[in-house]
Amino acid sequence: MRILGLDVGTKTVGVAISDEMGWTAQGLETIKINEERGQFGFDRISELVKQYDVDKIVVGLPKNMNGTIGPRGEACQQFAENLRELLQLDVVMWDERLSTMAAERLLISADVSRKKRKQVIDKMAAVVILQGFLDRK
């Protein structure tokens, strides 16, 4: 059983995958998307689901600090619902507040250059989201 973790942004989707035991999350890739053109990366996500034999997807839900859901959160919920319908898989939402900041701190502490951080931040945020989910199940 593998679980895919997604950090959905306006221009990219960070992707992470669990190990087969469901204990650890590893970054896979960053998928470029274009919301305005209706390009959400579903084809690539579908390929990854098949390639890694995924049976659950965790999508980060960006909440405001007071717990409310704003426009970005609503867009992520719609993204998750579209995935659920398209792939016929269990898709769960996971509170991702501060996941990008946590990923940034991780990369800084690992002495990753600013240029490289920019390239991998979404993938690392997906790792933080998925690892949070795995740690709590």
Curated annotation (Swiss-Prot):
Database matches in CDD domains: YqgF (cd16964)
Keyword terms, alphabetized: Cytoplasm, Hydrolase, Nuclease, Ribosome biogenesis
GO MF, one annotated term: nuclease activity
InterPro entries: RNaseH-like_sf, YqgF, YqgF/RNaseH-like_dom, YqgF/RNaseH-like_dom_sf
GO biological process per UniProt: rRNA 5'-end processing
Chief localization: cytoplasm
EC number assigned by the record: 3.1.-.-
Keyword Cytoplasm: yes
GO cellular component, one term: cytosol
Annotated Pfam families: RuvX (PF03652)
SMART domains named among the record's database cross-references: YqgFc
Enzyme class, UniProt record, top EC level: hydrolase
Subcellular location: Cytoplasm
PANTHER family: POLYNUCLEOTIDYL TRANSFERASE, RIBONUCLEASE H-LIKE SUPERFAMILY PROTEIN
Family: Belongs to the YqgF nuclease family.
Role: Could be a nuclease involved in processing of the 5'-end of pre-16S rRNA.
Entry protein name: Putative pre-16S rRNA nuclease
Species per Swiss-Prot/TrEMBL record: Bacillus cereus (strain AH187)
